[in-house]
Swiss-Prot record:
Classification via SMART domains: Ribosomal_S15
Upper lineage: Eukaryota, Viridiplantae, Streptophyta, Embryophyta, Tracheophyta
GO cellular component, as recorded: chloroplast; ribonucleoprotein complex; ribosome
Name of the protein described by the UniProt record: Small ribosomal subunit protein uS15c
Record's keyword annotation contains Cytoplasm: no
Length: 90
């Protein structure tokens, strides 16, 4: 992982980000995953921040629904994406 502006960014998505459509399911899942990881690290420090915890749950649900859609439409792209992002399969 590379650091850019204080944030960790996955190297394989940085170069693809410029070429790929930002509205694609893969890009949206990647974006949600970055936000989820940032919120999770925030909640480790601030355990009583319940509004951020609620936001984290909402993001997890959105990502789960997008992954379910991708798994239904194109299983190969789904497997590749979860492998690259290092997240569990549903």
């Amino acid at each position: 992982m590379k650091k850019k502006g204080g944030r960790k960014i996955l190297g394989f998505m940085v170069k693809e980000e410029k070429e790929e459509n930002r509205g694609s399911v893969e890009f949206q899942v990647f974006s949600f995953t970055n936000k989820i990881r940032r919120l999770a690290s925030h909640l480790e420090l601030h355990k009583k921040d319940f509004s951020s915890e609620r936001g984290l749950r909402r993001l997890l649900g959105k990502r789960r629904r997008l992954l379910a859609y991708l798994a239904k439409k194109n299983r190969v792209r789904y497997k590749k994406l979860i492998g690259q992002l290092n997240i569990r399969e549903q």
